[in-house]
Amino acid sequence: MKVAIVGASGYAGGELVRLLYHHSSAEVTCVTSRSLAGIPLSEVHPQLTGFSDLRFENPAPDAIDADVAFLAVPHTAAMTIAGKLLSRGIKVVDLSADYRLPKDTFEKVYGVTHTDYFPAPYGIPELHRKECINAKFVANPGCFPTGATLAAAPIASRAHTIIFDSKTGVSGAGDNPSATTHYPNVGDNVSPYKWTSHRHLAEMKQELSKLGSKAACYFTPHLVPVNRGILTTAHILLNEPLETKEVEKLYREYYKDEFFVRYQKPMLSAVRGSNFCDIMVESEGKRVVVVSAIDNLVKGASGQAIQNMNLMCGFKETDGLDAPGLLP
């Protein structure tokens, strides 16, 4: 099966190529970049030297030859491409935010007009597997909402307030240097940003609502001096008290059939480079604390995108993804 990665120069694009190298049925045959056409993929992603001889291309959407296309492009760019690919029978997984939210919500949160909106499955397979199976298009979730929603899902409907506090690695900001990600500003430091207004909060609220939760939801992210990973602490305030053993039983039962969700002490290093989400809970009266750990570039982006592709195309859900993390 031929795969195109549209916007392959960034971290997510590199991870897609790395992970798909191990897929039993998918072969990356096209990697695109508007500014790097003609340059070898391995020149931008040296970790792929010896694993791919592809060069970046800059084809028009109607010239892309593929069965599946991953859109690893900036927000607002996917809406100019997705429909054209779908009209040619190419299945699409969109890693941008363009189709994660209803049209009016997207336009309010991102401050732009959506020029080609259509509803799409929201690709957290553990929660929306049926919608993703055989789908022609899936909107891949944001990294923060993935870790947060998986942390809260089993107990969200019992809560009146949910507060997400996330620590994220610098790769989540992308590969364009900035003062925020400059080493002297990141090293030996922890800094909150967008304290009350991060755009991913809209996805979290959307997913909690789908889970039947009426809880008020709040979110604050922090940048920490690591390359990869998101550690999310969910403070879940319940309507009625639950003991830790009851909450633990509930979580174990909820995720018992989910290969990529493991009930164990969350550590960023244990999930680094993998598609796993590690979760553990503890409670005190009406307060439940849930901690989750994911790799923001894998379960938070490219790995989950491949997991969705597998569901869309009838492959084993773990194909290309069943490798452990990189501890230490």
Curated annotation (Swiss-Prot):
It is found in: Cytoplasm. The active site is at residue 143. Its EC number is 1.2.1.38. One of its GO terms (biological process) is L-arginine biosynthetic process. Pathway: Amino-acid biosynthesis; L-arginine biosynthesis; N(2)-acetyl-L-ornithine from L-glutamate: step 3/4. It catalyses: N-acetyl-L-glutamate 5-semialdehyde + phosphate + NADP(+) = N-acetyl-L-glutamyl 5-phosphate + NADPH + H(+). It is an enzyme of class 1 (oxidoreductase). Keywords: Amino-acid biosynthesis, Arginine biosynthesis, Cytoplasm, NADP, Oxidoreductase. Its main location: cytoplasm. One of its GO terms (molecular function) is NADP+ binding. Pfam families: Semialdhyde_dh (PF01118), Semialdhyde_dhC_1 (PF22698). The keyword Flavoprotein does not apply. NCBIfam families: argC. Belongs to the NAGSA dehydrogenase family. Type 1 subfamily. Catalyzes the NADPH-dependent reduction of N-acetyl-5-glutamyl phosphate to yield N-acetyl-L-glutamate 5-semialdehyde. This is N-acetyl-gamma-glutamyl-phosphate reductase. The gene is argC.
